[in-house]
Amino acid sequence: MNPVRIVAIALGIGAAAGGPAPDLSPATQILMENGSPYYVPATATVASGTPIRWDNPTPTHHTVTHNDCVTEAHPCLFDSGTVAPGGHFTVPGLPAGRYPYHCGIHPIMRGLLVVTDDRSTPSQL
């Protein structure tokens, strides 16, 4: 058998047995702003498992904090800590649900992430 064919067969077997493929979906981008609506878009809709990335193009520090992080009654699903100017924060994906969030430094900054079970749902920004 040709050595090239053996390598091709081995690679094919390795790819088939390698487990689930990583989600290579592009992240949905949300921008942090210093003025209203503060998070752009203010409400973002994505399919479950889709990565979400918040970018901070402002000259000010911000956070992205799930509202449940301020109570002990529910789990805190994401909290960026301080995101410096020019920085970003990414959540690899969330299960279906509604996730209100805010900036812990500037409480007037609020956003909503809506995650659907439908993988065919395009990111709605």
Which residue stretches match the model-derived regions?
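Bacterial N-terminal signal peptides
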Residues: 7-16
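Bacterial N-terminal signal peptides that target proteins for export
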Residues: 1-7
